[in-house]
Amino acid sequence: DIHYDPCIKAIDAGYHVLLEKPIAQNLVECNDIAEHAKRKGVLVCVCHVLRYHPYFLKIKEVVDSGELGKIISINHIASVGLDRTTHGFVRGLWRKEKLTNPMLIAKCCHDVDLLLWLTKTPCRKLSSFGSLRWFRSENAPEGSSKRCIDCSIETECPYSAVDLYYNRRSWISNFDIPAGKTLDDILMEELRHGMYGRCVFHCDNDVVDHQVLSMEMADEVTINLSMDIFTN
């Protein structure tokens, strides 16, 4: 959510920029970066690192070789997973569109880039549908509370923050531990008072929890991308 201003300043200083995805908050800012770089004569490259992963390089090699024949249609599933979703997109930093980006941009930039890279053609038509269907207050189970640590059904809940952070020690690498405190101290404080201790049905999230994207490419190849958080 803070890529635009530093990138513009780097361009003004004459630097070539390797920019982490997503490029910016909206299309206007993206175009502004591209036009500004062109005026200043510098390069801005987007950090789509999966293109250089051996797994995807092999897929690209097979597709380009013609071994599969002519590509007619691609069905791609972006399986986000419950732990990643509840941590990042329900309780965490990417939970609200206005604070960061829509879910498809925040989570599926790499997926869309890989699909364009594989097909080597621009998209000429698209449609997309999605909504926040599940992680809403009206879906909170009976007996639940606003915080997992106070919840009478916490031990039965697949979204338990106590289980995710305290018991399993998952998704905690970015929690700072000040001098004089232990990891247990920090986790218990977060569970009692922080945003990561909230019930997933009582957060202020608004990004979609499922979305489909259909694309028709310039060469008539069709692509279906399904972003699904309810996976492991």
Each model region followed by its residue ranges:
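Amphipathic alpha-helical segments in well-structured domains
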Residues: C30, Y52, F56, F230-N232
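Glycine-enriched catalytic-core subsegment of oxygenase/oxidase enzymes
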Residues: V200-N232
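Short glycine-enriched loops at secondary-structure junctions
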Residues: D1, I23-A24, I77-L82
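Soluble or luminal CAZymes and related metallo-dependent hydrolases
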Residues: I2, E29, R51, M103, ...
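Beta-strand-loop-alpha-helix segment that lines the small-molecule cofactor/substrate pocket
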Residues: Y4-R51, G66
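Predominantly a Rossmann-like dinucleotide-binding segment in NAD(P)-dependent oxidoreductases
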Residues: L50-G197
